[in-house]
Each structure stands twice: as structure tokens, then as C-alpha cells.
């Protein structure tokens, strides 16, 4: 296998036991990657050849440093993956992220960070956002992902750590509502995105790229310019085939339907005016 398809150094994948971690483990393992997997819960599937799993908590800094030894890339998919109270999010998503970046700094590794569309969730759907848009998180989860992108910028400016920020839309086996006709990211497109973010020779002159993580969906009119050409990624799948079944499947909540973040924007929403942002 060539260096164009397989990284020369091992790759550390955090959050390996989660839904997306399991998908990536299988796909990258089948591609011949040497994987070092970690999560705070046991890995539930058979390990692919070349993969080793280590039970560890992201809040255990020394453990994360040990796991990253010799790795050329860290795929940071660990942490809380949905909205939770701030005190629940802060440990794995803030402190754990810091430990991952410290490991990347020490190893000179590239960071591929599973960011989220919820970093910009309070932009309205009528807006077209580019990769340099203002961050408008729609909850504590999105706030933690926005913080992660800011931390990546700090570690690039101060330590030269490269980062690819993948603003993942809705990554599920298939779309399940009208919003996902725009935001859906297939598992195969996610895998190709992670591969290109890892294998690209450069992340551009700034050393950081933001990628909108959606498949080739004709209804995705909200997300514009990003760094996909820099890494050589083009989504191949599309939610369009599901349009007839899902087009009218909306929440009925005007807040949820106005903003790009969808259901997360409506959680604990208490604004009394209806003027938007």
C-alpha cells in the first residue's frame, strides 16, 4: 500500500466506541491503516488487523499523552456528542480536548477534529455561510466545538499544530427529516473526508481548514466556501433520493425551522421576542 492511501505513522482515534468511531475503525482498518483506538468504554466490535484498543478517559492527560506516542495524526471524535448541561460537557469536551491538543503538540501530529454544524447553529437558514463566518453556537455542545476550533487556532499560531475542523452535519445511515435533506453526511462521505484530511500533504498556508460536513445534497444552500479543495475531498453521496419521503417532515416549531442548528436551537429556548438574530 502506498503513502497516498495509508499514513506512514499510526493514527490515534479517540471516541472509537461511539457510533462514528466504530464506522471509521472498520473503514480505516479495511484500508490498511494502523490504528490506536481509545474510549472510556470497551470497543464493542472485533478489532481490524493493525488496530489496538486502549481503555482511557479523555480527562486523564497522562494517558492520552502515552497513547499518542509515535502517532502522526489524531482523529479527535471523543467527548459528549449531543446537548447536555454545561457541567457535563466541560470535562470531556474542554479538558479532554486540551489533552488531545497537548498530545498533538508534543508529537508534532496533525489534528482532525470532529467539529459540528452546531458551532454555527444560530445562523438563519436564509444565510449562506463560508468557512470564515462568525461562530454562533446553539447550545453548550456547540459551544464546546467552537472552543475546540479556537483552541486549534491557538495551537497552530503558537506551536505549529495543523488542524482540520470537520463541521459535521447529520451523520447517520440515512436522513430522517426534511432538515437532513440539506445536512446529511453519509458514512462513506465521512470516511473519505477523514481520509483526505489525514493524507493531504498540506492543510494550506494557514495550516488550518474548515470543511462543511455534508454530502452532495441539492437542498444544502446554507453552506458555501470551505477548504475541501485544499485537501482534495468531494462528497459522492446525496440525500436527494429521500426527498419525496421526507420533504414535508418538519418539526412544526418556528425556532427550530428558522435556524441552521435545527432541534438544538429549541432546547431550553426562552427568548420572548420573535425578531430573530
Annotate each language-model stretch with its function.
Residues 168-174, 184-207, 216:
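Alpha-helical substrate-binding/gating segment
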Residues 91, 124-163:
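Catalytic helix-loop patch of NAD(P)-dependent Rossmann-fold dehydrogenases
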Residues 44, 209-210, 216-238, 248-275:
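Conserved C-terminal active-site "lid" loop/helix of NAD(P)H-dependent oxidoreductases
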Residues 59, 88-99, 135, 143-146, ...:
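Glycine-rich NAD(P)-binding loop of the Rossmann-fold in SDR/ketoreductase-type enzymes
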Residues 99-138:
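Conserved Rossmann-fold NAD(P)-dependent oxidoreductase catalytic core, especially the SDR/UDP-sugar
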Residues 11-31:
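N-terminal Rossmann NAD(P)H-binding glycine-rich loop of SDR-like oxidoreductase domains
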Residues 44, 52-92:
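NAD(P)H-binding glycine-rich loop region in Rossmannoid oxidoreductase-like domains
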Residues 32-44:
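Conserved glycine-rich Rossmann-like NAD(P)H-binding loop of the short-chain dehydrogenase/reductase
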Amino acid at each position: 500500500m502506498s503513502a497516498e492511501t495509508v499514513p506512514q505513522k499510526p493514527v490515534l482515534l479517540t471516541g472509537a466506541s461511539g457510533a462514528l468511531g466504530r464506522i471509521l475503525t472498520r473503514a480505516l482498518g479495511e484500508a490498511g491503516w494502523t490504528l490506536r483506538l481509545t474510549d472510556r468504554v470497551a470497543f464493542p466490535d472485533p478489532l481490524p488487523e493493525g488496530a489496538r484498543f486502549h481503555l482511557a478517559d479523555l480527562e486523564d492527560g497522562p494517558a492520552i499523552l502515552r497513547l499518542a506516542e509515535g502517532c502522526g495524526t489524531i482523529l479527535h471524535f471523543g467527548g459528549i456528542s449531543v446537548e447536555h448541561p454545561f457541567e457535563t460537557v466541560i470535562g470531556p469536551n474542554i479538558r479532554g480536548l486540551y489533552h488531545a491538543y497537548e498530545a498533538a503538540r508534543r508529537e508534532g501530529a496533525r489534528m482532525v477534529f470532529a467539529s459540528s454544524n452546531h458551532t454555527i447553529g444560530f445562523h438563519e437558514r436564509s444565510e449562506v455561510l463560508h468557512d470564515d463566518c462568525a461562530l454562533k453556537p446553539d447550545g453548550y455542545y456547540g459551544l464546546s466545538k467552537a472552543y475546540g476550533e479556537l483552541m486549534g487556532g491557538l495551537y497552530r499560531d503558537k506551536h505549529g499544530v495543523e488542524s482540520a475542523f470537520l463541521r459535521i452535519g447529520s451523520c447517520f445511515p440515512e436522513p430522517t427529516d426534511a432538515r437532513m435533506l440539506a445536512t446529511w453526511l453519509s458514512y462513506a462521505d465521512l470516511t473519505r473526508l477523514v481520509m483526505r484530511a489525514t493524507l493531504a500533504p498540506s492543510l494550506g498556508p494557514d495550516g488550518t481548514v474548515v470543511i462543511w460536513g455534508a454530502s452532495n445534497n441539492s437542498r444544502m444552500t446554507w453552506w458555501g466556501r470551505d477548504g475541501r479543495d485544499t485537501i482534495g475531498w468531494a462528497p459522492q453521496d446525496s440525500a436527494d433520493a429521500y426527498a419525496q419521503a421526507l420533504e414535508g417532515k418538519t418539526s412544526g416549531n418556528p425556532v427550530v425551522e428558522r435556524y441552521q442548528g435545527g432541534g438544538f436551537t429549541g432546547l431550553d429556548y426562552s427568548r420572548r421576542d420573535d425578531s430573530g438574530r
